[in-house]
UniProtKB/Swiss-Prot annotation:
Pfam families attached to this UniProt entry: peroxidase
Marked site (Transition state stabilizer) residue numbers: 118
Residues covered by region (Disordered): 1-22, 291-320
Keyword Metal-binding: yes
GO function terms (MF aspect): catalase activity; heme binding; metal ion binding
Organism (species): Streptomyces griseus subsp. griseus (strain JCM 4626 / CBS 651.72 / NBRC 13350 / KCC S-0626 / ISP 5235)
Annotated catalytic residues: 122
Gene Ontology CC terms, in alphabetical order: cytosol
Cofactor details (free text): Binds 1 heme b (iron(II)-protoporphyrin IX) group per dimer.
Protein name (record): Catalase-peroxidase
Post-translational modification: Formation of the three residue Trp-Tyr-Met cross-link is important for the catalase, but not the peroxidase activity of the enzyme.
């Protein structure tokens, strides 16, 4: 709905960036205030180590949302609190807000519904399928940078209007859920039947630092393209600060056909096909209007840059009253239908009934007006005024792009089909980042199984008991499979998980299905050998006529058995925790195209960097650790353990700093920190290295993902813990804990 990567593993800082600029404080120089222009920023302003070493690893992304930042405490159970809500009563309270216009920000057409639809859309619309980041799941629209994106102009007012509802229901209704629920209520009160709503989005209490929004340092800049307008991965918008595309056309060029290319690419990157794209654009633009009553120069600072007395509101306009009919948001001034607060099919009628000519809004933005048309479109604040139908450049893309036109005409002729398509696409848009349906809460969750939710079959039968688990471990270890093979297969299965959108993981055993079984990082031939052997173990166990074991459980159990054996060989007895209950998904429950987005282009835990990776390996390792929701200590111990267990992709010896591969020792850390060796680069890209001892003999080889644990001061401090003479037991214990965490990341059925 328009008005208008990899995570941050390092912190680019420019001299004039907002985080390094020092605000002028009246009287500061005269009073000797330390906050003086031209000085390095105080730590409270974002100064510190990053000021001096902007390319240093940002380990803070491995410590997201710490417990000390949560005012609710660790015992707060949001799911239980949400279940206690009277949801119909909440919706009635929201509906009352929607039709109670406030003088401080008057409602267009007497109804805030369209504004709230845009708010919900923009909350969810930051999601991108490539890394699963963005989306509505944590209510990040409240925080920088999203609260101040140009495309989110004046949505601060929408959230402020909802404060009475939030205040009434307190922590039983998160902001994240409230934003999406309000979008649904807005649609319903304007005559549309939604597909459903699920709660369960828990609020966080700090801005995300792990999302790469683009390389630009200026709003609406577009340095993200190369070649023939090829958009950088994993980005999902065409310009910095936009949700999707520029409504005026590419870089403001009012070309509907060229705009269609941008639309298709950006919507594809958030998992929408052409039909869903048309439904969302047309459905959203059935309601409300854009705002461009005057020049953009009249608009003040965004919420994050506004003075304290604005109390979190931004974009104060000096143009006339600055609100209502004088409001400025995108600079465009378009109302699409004659019934902007009621669901209908008029958008398509207006799209096809007229020829349009290019014009400009009062703010000077490119838009289109119907030729030879009557003035049928109402004014939002003056009932005596009417205007001709108008469209955005991106609206006309639905008419002039051949594929979009075909869909649009079908929807025009079949209103019920259009309504169903919009309902489903809206539900997908607003729930795409929530993960499996086990996480959905509330009485309005649809019963229909949807492929994009990565469905799993229902679990049947009794879970395995301790004796059966022990017997299966013995059977696994009696095969010809090595520790490295078993560990690698389990990691390939479980480490596909992404904490960003809760997709992937071991449950479902999709590692045996397309597309995962063919991923380069998973060593397809080696993986196939392991799966055949484990399927044999499964068949033997199942044939006894008692309980059945899923391959999903068996893959994880086998990896755990291998870890136990490797620890035993190192002289440490340990039991790897295992909770049965995983199920096996079928190929027809797996959207191959959608799952392809989960393929790792890099995995530092397996010392794997694919050809498409664009950052040095140590940054990519942190990005993968962030997606796996790992801390810095967990990342450190897992890398050290997986190296000595031989879990590298392709059997690479890089980083296998041990004479006892397959044994769970702390040798990786001991040998990395050995004062008797010297590391030197062996590649022009400086991504491969060799270590020589005093005699000049090559002792080890490694990559940037290995050497960083001796180079980065914070990671070295962690490596020193595990390299200590007293660390043998602690290393194994911590490795097992971190391993088990990864194996269970997708076990939402256990919550």
């Amino acid at each position: 709905m328009t008005e208008n990567h990899e995570s941050h593993v390092f912190d680019p800082v420019t001299p004039d960036s907002p985080e390094t600029a020092v605000p002028e404080v009246p009287g500061a120089q005269a009073a000797g205030c330390p906050v003086a222009h031209g000085r390095a920023p105080h730590p409270t302003q974002g100064g510190g180590n990053r000021q001096w070493w902007p390319d240093r690893l940002n380990l803070k992304i491995l410590a997201k949302n710490p417990a000390v930042a949560n005012p609710l405490g660790g015992d707060f159970d949001y799911a239980a609190a949400f279940r206690g809500l009277d949801l119909p009563a909440v919706k009635r309270d929201i509906a009352e807000v929607l039709t109670t216009s406030q003088d401080w920000w008057p409602a267009d057409f007497g109804n805030y519904g369209p504004l709230m639809i845009r708010m919900a859309w923009h909350s969810a619309g930051t999601y991108r399928i490539s890394d699963g980041r963005g989306g509505a799941g944590a209510g990040q629209q409240r925080f920088a940078p999203l609260n101040s994106w140009p495309d989110n102009g004046n949505l601060d007012k929408a959230r402020r209007l909802l404060w009475p509802v939030k205040k009434k229901y307190g922590q039983a209704l998160s902001w994240a859920d409230l934003l999406i629920l309000t979008g649904n209520v807005a649609l319903e009160t304007m005559g549309f039947k939604t597909f459903g709503f699920a709660g369960g989005r828990e609020d966080v209490w700090e801005s995300e630092e792990d999302v790469y929004w683009g390389p630009e340092t200026t709003w609406l800049d577009d340095e993200r393209y190369t070649g023939d307008r090829e958009l950088e991965n994993p980005l999902g918008a065409v310009q910095m600060g936009l949700i999707y595309v520029n409504p005026e056309g590419p870089n403001g060029n009012p070309d509907p056909v060229a705009a269609a290319r941008d639309i298709r690419e950006t919507f594809r990157r958030m998992a929408m096909n052409d039909e869903e794209t048309v439904a969302l654009i047309a459905g959203g633009h059935t309601f409300g209007k854009t705002h461009g009553a005057g020049p953009a120069e009249s608009v003040g600072a965004d919420p994050e840059g506004a003075p304290l007395e604005e109390q979190g509101l931004g974009w104060r306009s000096s143009y006339r009253s600055g609100k209502g009919g004088d409001a400025i948001t995108s600079g465009l001034e378009v109302t699409w239908t004659s019934t902007p607060t009621r669901w209908g099919n008029e958008f398509f009628h207006n799209l096809f009934a007229y020829e349009y000519e290019l014009t400009k809004s009062p703010a000077g933005a490119h838009q289109w007006i119907a030729k030879d048309a009557e003035a049928t479109i109402p004014d939002a604040h003056d009932a005596s005024k009417k205007q001709k139908p108008q469209m955005l450049t991106t609206d006309l893309s639905l008419r002039f792009d051949p594929a979009y036109e075909q869909i649009s005409r079908r929807f025009h002729e079949n209103p019920e089909e259009f309504a169903d398509a919009f309902a489903r696409a809206w539900y997908k848009l607003t729930h795409r980042d929530m993960g499996p349906v086990q996480r959905y809460l509330g009485p309005e969750v649809p019963s229909e199984v949807l492929l994009w939710q990565d469905p799993l079959p229902a679990r049947t039968g009794e879970p395995l008991d301790a004796a059966e688990i022990a017997a299966l471990k013995e059977q696994v270890l009696a095969t010809d499979l090595t520790v490295a093979q078993l560990v690698s297969a389990a990691w390939a299965s479980a480490a596909s998980f992404r904490g960003s959108d809760k997709r992937g993981g071991a449950n479902g055993a999709r590692v045996r299905l397309e597309p995962q079984r063919g991923w380069e990082a998973n060593d397809p031939d080696e993986l196939a050998q392991v799966l055949r052997a484990l399927e044999g173990v499964k068949e033997s166990f199942d044939a006894k006529g008692g309980k059945q074991v899923s391959l999903a459980d068996l893959i994880v159990l086998a990896g755990g058995a291998a870890v136990e054996q490797a620890a035993k060989d190192a002289g440490v007895e340990v039991e790897v925790p295992f909770t049965p209950g995983r199920v096996d998904a079928a190929q027809d429950q797996t959207d191959v195209e959608s799952f392809a987005a989960l393929e790792p282009a890099y995995d530092g835990f397996r010392n794997y960097v694919g050809k498409a990776a664009r950052l040095p390996a140590e940054y990519l390792l942190l990005d993968r650790a962030n997606l796996l929701t790992l801390s810095a200590p967990e990342t450190t111990v897992l890398v050290g353990g997986l190296r000595v267990l031989g879990a590298n992709t392709g059997g690479s010896k890089h980083g296998v700093l041990t004479d006892r591969p397959g044994t769970l020792t702390n040798d990786f850390f001991v040998n990395l920190l050995d004062l008797g060796i010297t590391w030197k680069s062996t590649s022009s890209a400086q991504d491969e290295f060799e270590a020589r001892d005093a005699s000049g003999k090559v002792k080890w080889t490694g990559t940037r993902a290995d050497l960083v644990f001796g180079s980065n001061s914070e990671l070295r401090a962690l490596a020193e813990v595990y390299a200590g003479d007293d660390a043998r037991q602690k290393f194994v214990t911590d490795f097992v804990a971190a391993w088990s965490k990864v194996m269970d990341l997708d076990r939402f059925d256990l919550v």
